[in-house]
């Protein structure tokens, strides 16, 4: 039996030295599939946007705690973001220019200067596109907004993720008649997002003005906003070498075989990736 596992280890080493295998996973912030709670309060308390106004911006901090599912790997490549919205009563098309910026940061909170919360300076555009949301097709139903990044963003282990999103209407009148016509689902994780809302001025222009980085209520900013339920699609390449030998698992942890297939619960004996490490399951 000992020789059998030594042989498996040798095969694994040859396999991974010959070709680095990328693995895919999804990280859910909040209960994405079964979300029931919406953002409360004013229209400026909704992330990643509100269709009630023509121009919005949002900054969201996803900490290592929220991203714990990938922290066993040296890094992950973020491929896409998906948010979930309920279309209560809107039936017209909404067209927006959408831009997404991503940065790795050490901070887990927004700074406060003279009692005023501060936006982060932002850079590193990873998505830019014009999106038309066909709300009539989702009248009275859930709708997912998925954004596939034009280039993957690499996030190193131990870093927090700052996501800045800008939505600009092509026509300032292209808005819903009520803040409650379209509502995004909240994760319940409070204080990790801040918003900007205006019917005439883009967040990009605001970021170039003298009031930035202040997030003042008089500027239509929400400063204690929940993270929305979010699905983050990632890929990662595990390190080489066998790290440990395990008995067949019965838990809910994710294991990947050498073909990149995902397993949970009991699985056949073999070589798997678990928490960014190669393990032998016997």
Where in this protein do the model-derived segments appear?
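Bacterial Sec-dependent N-terminal signal peptides
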Residues: 1-24
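C-terminal tail/sorting-segment detector
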Residues: 3, 271-282
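Beta-sheet-rich sandwich/jelly-roll-like modules and their strand-loop junctions
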Residues: 21-107, 170, 186-238
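Short, flexible beta-strand-to-coil junctions
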Residues: 85-87, 165-172, 274-278
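Aromatic- and Gly/Pro-enriched, solvent-exposed loop/edge beta-strand patches characteristic
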Residues: 99-188
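Residue-level detector of functionally pivotal "anchor" positions at catalytic/ligand-binding pockets or at interdomain
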Residues: 232-259
